Structures are given as C-alpha cells and as structure tokens.
C-alpha cells in the first residue's frame, strides 16, 4: 500500500514537472534511463490517458513493460492497449501515432533485459509479484 501511494505521488510529480517545463524536463529517469510518454484510449472512459514509462529502443520501436513498479495490480494502460492498440508515443517532445503490440518469446526477453540494464529494479519487480509482467513493442508510424 505504501509503495503504491509512493508510485502514484512520483508519477503525479513527474507529470507536473514535464508539464511545467513544457516537456524539457522528465525525459529521463535518474541515471539517464529513457522515458517515453504513451497516450492510450481509455477502454471504459473513451478518454485519452498519458503515462510516462521507461523504454528501450528495439527493432525500430520502443519496448515497454506493464510492471506498475512491481505492484500486483496491472496498470490501466495495459488494459487500454489490449482493447485499442493504436495510440501515441512522445519521444523527446516528438509525438507520433503508434501501434502497441504485446510480445512474447525472444523479443519479450530482449526488451525486459534492456529495461533491467537501464533500471535494475525491474529485476526485483518480477521477483516480488505473482503475475506476469506484460511486455509491448510500441511502433511509431512513419510521418
């Protein structure tokens, strides 16, 4: 419960800093890990939802994971992209339409290993929860 509250607070602060700086700040995690902003269509609300996530470049796209910082609850954006796989990705202030594809096997392993190499807590997340962490490839559309 405490960890969930801390995560929500951190995400709220991250969003505010990104907004207040007009996107100049909040593009990396501590240590330099890349942050992308995904925008997904809410499966229930029909409203667009914007979420900051750690990401790794791979195969012409970006690998992301629904870790929810190691909480048992699957993040809402995962459910959203499973219903509506089209959304947007913002990389360094450049937003593009994108397709979200859940991956498995070798690609899933490579993305997750890349995330661990940038933010070692990902290893702890998988150890500490009982659910599978869904992994996605976000492929930006060509302009």
Q: Where would I find each of the regions flagged by the language model?
A:
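Extreme N-terminal tail/first-helix region
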Residues: 1-29
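Short beta-strand segments
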Residues: 33-69
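Short beta-strand element of the conserved SAM-dependent methyltransferase core
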Residues: 38, 136-141
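Short strand-connecting beta-turns/loops that link adjacent beta-strands
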Residues: 58-60, 94, 143
């Amino acid at each position: 419960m405490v960890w969930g509250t801390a995560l929500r607070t951190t995400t709220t602060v991250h969003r505010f800093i990104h907004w207040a700086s007009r996107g100049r700040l909040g593009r990396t995690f501590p240590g330099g890990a890349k942050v992308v902003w995904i925008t997904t269509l809410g499966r229930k609300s029909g409203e667009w939802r914007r979420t900051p996530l750690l990401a790794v470049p791979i195969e012409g796209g970006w690998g992301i994971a629904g870790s929810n910082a190691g909480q048992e609850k699957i993040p809402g954006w995962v459910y959203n992209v499973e219903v509506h796989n089209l959304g947007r990705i913002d990389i360094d202030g450049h937003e593009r339409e994108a397709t979200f594809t859940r991956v498995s096997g070798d690609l899933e392993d490579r993305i997750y290993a890349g995330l661990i190499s940038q933010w070692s807590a990902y290893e702890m997340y998988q150890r500490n929860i009982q659910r599978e962490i869904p992994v996605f490839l976000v492929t930006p559309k060509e302009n």
